């Protein structure tokens, strides 16, 4: 496993041993970032169910302004931190060790506090791109996370024009809509698929 492009191009990344973590393949990651390329530089990126952090690190390598990693499995967290340390990435990221739900709730609370204040939500609290890759068999995780992102509460942490991408089994299609999130395309590659969502136009 390696970084595909950018400032850390070709640098190796580690993954925990065993079958507990299923990192996004280099090929699928390359396909993903070929599509996202025009949006990456300067963006705020959320890598949910981040595992080894390979997707978020790829975003940093390609110029993302800030990446939020959400992961709670200790073996994956250890690999993620080792990868960040090996690449000497010391800033421009936040790791939420309590998992995806905790990160989204934390950002939603910050957005709510900011909306009640005299000043608007600070740009760094808003997300341009979200990538989520739960265990493929965990349908409840997709429903919970996509449902939250598609709700009014979730919408408060997404910039207008934000994109949400979910990796899942190519044999199990995701719903075309989660609240205000509407599926725009699905790309299949072997056993994996990427489904892209955008906020519905008001």
Show the residue positions of the predicted features:
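Class I S-adenosyl-L-methionine-dependent methyltransferase catalytic core
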Residues: 1-202
